[in-house]
Design a protein with these regions (language model features):
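Basic, nucleic-acid-binding surfaces and adjacent catalytic neighborhoods in DNA/RNA-processing proteins
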Residues: 1-108
Length: 108
């Protein structure tokens, strides 16, 4: 699903950190196949796309600042950091050729 969300033909403007943020908030594993998610997961995904894009426009786009505290953004850049929600270790790995940060305890 991560590769689909990064495809600019379908989701223009969605960058790597934004896709990680969306999937984390939607509680979806970035390795899931895009055709294999339920309608409930799909609805949650689209809701989080809107939330993250709007939040990024308000915080990052306006002044070039960082997203709000509590976002995955702040914990995704280095190995060994903890999930802001669960305080469990985050995984950083390559998915679809991109560095991906996700929390296996909540992203199924």
């Amino acid at each position: 699903i991560k590769a689909l969300l990064l495809d600019q033909r379908y989701f223009p403007g969605m960058g790597n950190w934004m896709v990680d943020e969306v999937l984390w908030r939607a509680k979806l594993n970035p390795s899931n196949l895009s055709g294999g998610i339920s309608k409930t997961d799909e609805n949650r995904l689209f809701k989080q796309i809107l939330f993250v894009v709007n939040g990024a426009i308000k915080s990052v786009g306006k002044h070039g600042g960082d997203p709000p505290k509590g976002w995955l953004f702040h914990a995704r850049w280095k190995d060994g950091l903890l999930c802001p929600k669960t305080k469990n270790p985050l995984i950083r790995e390559q998915i679809g050729g991109r560095t991906t940060c996700w929390c296996p305890s909540i992203q199924k």
